[in-house]
């Protein structure tokens, strides 16, 4: 055991930079002499030498990097060959993109302002609405946008700019507008002209988009093709494709009635094609407001303005929030959303059957009715098979003023809780109270007070809307 040293001796000792091997091993206080006093006392003075230290890795790296830096200028000097500087194709493209790419990228706001003409009066001037079956039968094509340039293979340098065109393509559905040209001021005098070919296919996100069209033609052809007939043109009957693979809610409920059957047959459930739903939405609006031969010129003009206002409320105010939330969704997310919807719908139906309630109707965010209660059928006179055995929309059972009010509240306020100073009803995050005129089986309308509730998924996307209707009877 090592003898304890007095305090005076401990204070007089001074540490040294390097100990001998013996003192280092035994953790003893060594001195600067060689041999040290500890080794002399133990008669091992012949082997007393400094402890060799390992080279630090940090020092080794610094020495290596310094030596490399010293050698670099020499190598550069020997490798440089005097002569003219030649730019590689990669360098030229890089410099060209740096000079002109920022100037040529159009923002989403600019594109919407330049392509929203079909939302105004052009949407309701001449032509006819096509059958939604073209959404399925016509193969998709790419969107080609050019500005009178020469290189068709170059694309946007910014992935965000390309994504803006992709989202815009999904919104307005210009699937085959290969002749579309988005010009920019003084584009002929600028050298860095940007071309976009095959930015996005119309079916890039077919189950998410709010697309209206997938047919060809330019913007003008699009306006003519999807506009409402003028006074001089004859109204044509709009046919519905009976061969479309659409499973009505009535038939779906016959196949799956309980939660157990739902889990057994969940592999057969497919994502709902909301794109076709929005196509039929516009078709239904056209039939309700315009497709009447008894309308005079003044009434027809007012109806056209009303339809244009409704379409704007969907595309301008609703899609901005919807696309920002659902831009990263894939088809698997839509499948999960559909499974959640159907399972939630089973719970709602079970609750309405067990508990006596007010007349209830449940519909998707497109307005497609999924369920009506027995009280609703008793109130309106329509049977469940009449309503649920086809693609029915909730606004089909309202008058024109209620339809306009419906789109103002559902698409502009309730879906994403957008504030509105003009709203004359109390509301919260998930429900609101309002009034509407409900269509009865005999063709008349019944004034009702309504409570509309929204059910959202985990991404805060509206999935189901529930409407409670309480009739208001005038007391004389």
UniProtKB/Swiss-Prot annotation:
Region ranges (Disordered): 48-73
Keyword set, alphabetical order: DNA-binding, Metal-binding, Nucleus, Transcription, Transcription regulation, Zinc
GO MF, one example: zinc ion binding
Ranges of residues in domain PAS: 347-417
Keyword Nucleus (UniProt): yes
CDD domains: GAL4, PAS
Pfam families the record matches: PAS_13, Zn_clus
Keyword match Transferase: no
Subcellular location: Nucleus
Function recorded in the entry: Transcription factor which regulates nonfermentable carbon utilization.
Family to which the UniProt record says this protein belongs: Belongs to the ERT1/acuK family.
Protein name: Glucose starvation modulator protein 1
Native source species: Vanderwaltozyma polyspora (strain ATCC 22028 / DSM 70294 / BCRC 21397 / CBS 2163 / NBRC 10782 / NRRL Y-8283 / UCD 57-17) (Kluyveromyces polysporus)
């Amino acid at each position: 055991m090592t003898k304890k040293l007095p305090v005076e001796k401990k204070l007089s000792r001074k540490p040294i930079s390097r100990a001998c091997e013996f003192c280092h091993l035994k953790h003893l206080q060594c001195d600067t002499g060689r041999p040290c006093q500890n080794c002399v006392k133990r008669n091992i003075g012949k082997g007393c030498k400094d402890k060799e230290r390992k080279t630090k890795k940090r020092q080794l790296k610094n020495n290596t990097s310094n030596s490399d830096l010293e050698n670099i200028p020499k190598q550069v000097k020997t490798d440089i060959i005097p002569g003219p500087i030649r730019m590689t194709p990669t360098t030229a493209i890089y410099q060209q993109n740096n000079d002109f790419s920022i100037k040529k990228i159009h923002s989403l706001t600019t594109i919407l302002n330049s392509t929203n003409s079909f939302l105004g009066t052009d949407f309701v001037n001449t032509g006819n609405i096509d059958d939604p079956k073209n959404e399925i039968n016509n193969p998709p094509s790419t969107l080609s946008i050019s500005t009178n340039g020469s290189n068709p293979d170059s694309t946007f340098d910014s992935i965000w700019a390309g994504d803006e065109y992709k989202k815009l393509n999904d919104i307005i559905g210009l699937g085959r507008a290969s002749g579309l040209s988005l010009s920019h001021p003084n584009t002929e005098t600028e050298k860095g002209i940007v071309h976009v070919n095959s930015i996005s296919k119309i079916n890039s996100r077919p189950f998410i988009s709010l697309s209206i069209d997938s047919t060809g033609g330019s913007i003008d052809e699009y306006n003519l093709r999807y506009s409402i007939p003028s006074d001089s043109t004859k109204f044509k009957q709009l046919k519905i494709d009976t061969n479309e693979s659409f499973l009505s809610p009535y038939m779906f409920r016959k196949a799956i009635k309980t939660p157990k059957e739902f889990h057994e047959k969940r592999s057969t459930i497919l994502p709902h094609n909301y794109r076709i739903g929005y196509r039929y939405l516009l078709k239904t609006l056209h039939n309700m407001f315009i497709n009447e031969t008894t309308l005079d010129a003044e009434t027809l003009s007012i109806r056209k303005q009303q339809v244009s206002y409704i379409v704007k409320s969907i595309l301008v105010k609703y899609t901005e929030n919807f696309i920002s939330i659902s831009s990263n969704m894939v088809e698997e997310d839509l499948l999960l959303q559909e499974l959640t919807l159907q399972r939630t719908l089973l719970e709602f139906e079970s609750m309405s059957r067990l508990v006596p309630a007010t007349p209830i109707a449940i519909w998707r965010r497109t307005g497609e009715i999924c369920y009506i209660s027995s009280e609703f059928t008793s109130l309106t006179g329509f049977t469940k098979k009449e309503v649920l055995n086809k693609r029915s929309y909730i606004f089909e059972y309202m008058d024109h003023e209620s339809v306009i009010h419906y789109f103002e509240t559902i698409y502009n306020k309730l879906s994403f809780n957008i504030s509105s100073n003009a709203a004359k009803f109390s509301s919260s995050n998930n429900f609101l109270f309002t009034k509407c005129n409900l269509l009865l089986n005999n063709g008349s309308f019944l004034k009702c007070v309504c409570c509309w509730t929204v059910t959202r998924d985990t991404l805060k996307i509206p999935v189901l809307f529930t409407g409670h209707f309480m009739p208001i009877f005038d007391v004389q």
